[in-house]
Amino acid sequence: MIRRLQDSGDLVRAFPRVHFVGIGGTGMSGIAEVMLTLGYEVSGSDNSDNVATRRLAKLGARVMRGHSAANVLGTDCVVVSSAIRDDNPELMEARSQRIPIMPRAAMLAELMRFRRGIAVAGTHGKTTTTSLAAAVLSEGGLDPTFVIGGQLLAAGANAKLGGGQWLVAEADESDGSFLRLNPLMAVITNIDADHLENYGNDFARIQAAFAEFLQRLPFYGLSLLCIDDPEVAALAGRTPRHVMSYGMSENADVRAEDVVQDGPRMRFTLRLPEGTTTPVTLALPGRHNVLNALAAAAIGWQLGVAPGTIARALENFAGIGRRFNDLGEVTTSTGARVRVVDDYGHHPRELEAVFAAARGGWPDKRLVVAFQPHRYSRTRDQFDAFAAVLSTVDALVLSEVYPAGEAPIPGADSRALARAIRARGRSEPVVVGQIASLAEVLPDVLQDGDLLLMMGAGDIGYVAQHIINNGFVGEPA
């Protein structure tokens, strides 16, 4: 049947049904929620049931467990996560029925088409920076739409359709999909060697992709670049777009001065381009989070948010799920009282930043880390760096690698990593074969007063929550 489009206001009515394959993923669920709010009939499928799928179902989405060709019948468009294989039965059925298939990033680009887009890219810090930017713009009365790769705790969601003209979203470089976006502002937090498997194991191709990302800006667009990162600083010198820099360097346009850590908070002086200085107390620990806050402050300043309002947003920021998420204290079966922090960090540079934040905030505590490596390829590519940074903690428990769909790689598993750490002579790692057994092993390692960091991008976060809810007994459901 040929459908008639009378005007742009009829788009939802003309093509109302959108189906998401892999709807439970952080990037997918956020887009699905925005489209639900726009009035689309949203359905989706996922192999797992999680907080995101339950929230979407409560909001009115039709969510199916598992993948089946029948799930896409009657839909007008299929949105697919990059984690989904081409032979997925829903994709095969959509092709046979000639239903349009949109990659996740392409649908995000469609949403951005109807707003003024701010895209936050970088190997590390995207989620926190995007969340802080959304908080600053919200505090400034701009009511932005946001799509974030983690749960913004104040909103209880990772996405919201705002009434304002700005949309702020993460731009995912991991698979090159950020090159589908056409924002008005582009942030680059840092550039590091990660996801090399998607770039032919060639770091130069990652560098080139970020350069191309800035080329997606219109001639009147703005690049917001962290010049404390050497790779980003090099890019700033050769990008043919307007550039505004941020960082702790003296030549940064937006910079932090007199930075000190006060427990779980950071205090600094925010210096803006016209010379205005404002004291800031950031409700997040670590110098890396100061840089994330500077990017958000630069965005706010560009859009006319007052310095005092920026500072208030940063001080009142409630945090993001699994980004140095202080879950509180719990008592082990041996009577030790420990503080548990859950964090998504899974790259050596992220681990180093989180360890520094933990030691800066709790210098008198022993730092105990439970780490679940993420992907065999990353463990192989960053093996020496992982061994170096993990050997700096007071006690370490390693679970087996979370494969994320990868086949095992010889010499890139947790036992090999433990041997490399042990050879450095600074710690004696404990290796747990199954992540479900982690909670029962930890009491043998923990002492009273310890700070326990639960880290990784896999399912270790469920173990952290299980420990808070049930103690160090049993296995996560």
From Swiss-Prot:
It catalyses: UDP-N-acetyl-alpha-D-muramate + L-alanine + ATP = UDP-N-acetyl-alpha-D-muramoyl-L-alanine + ADP + phosphate + H(+). It is an enzyme of class 6 (ligase). GO terms for biological process: cell division; cell wall organization; peptidoglycan biosynthetic process; regulation of cell shape. InterPro entries: Mur-like_cat_sf (IPR036565), Mur_ligase_C (IPR004101), Mur_ligase_C_dom_sf (IPR036615), Mur_ligase_cen (IPR013221), Mur_ligase_N (IPR000713), MurCDEF_pg_biosynth (IPR050061), UDP-N-AcMur_Ala_ligase_MurC (IPR005758). One of its GO terms (molecular function) is UDP-N-acetylmuramate-L-alanine ligase activity. Its main location: cytoplasm. Keywords: ATP-binding, Cell cycle, Cell division, Cell shape, Cell wall biogenesis/degradation, Cytoplasm, Ligase, Nucleotide-binding, Peptidoglycan synthesis. GO terms for cellular component: cytoplasm. It holds the Pfam family Mur_ligase_C. Its EC number is 6.3.2.8. Pathway: Cell wall biogenesis; peptidoglycan biosynthesis. ATP binds at residues 122-128. It is found in: Cytoplasm. Cell wall formation. Belongs to the MurCDEF family. This is UDP-N-acetylmuramate--L-alanine ligase. It comes from Xanthomonas oryzae pv. oryzae (strain KACC10331 / KXO85).
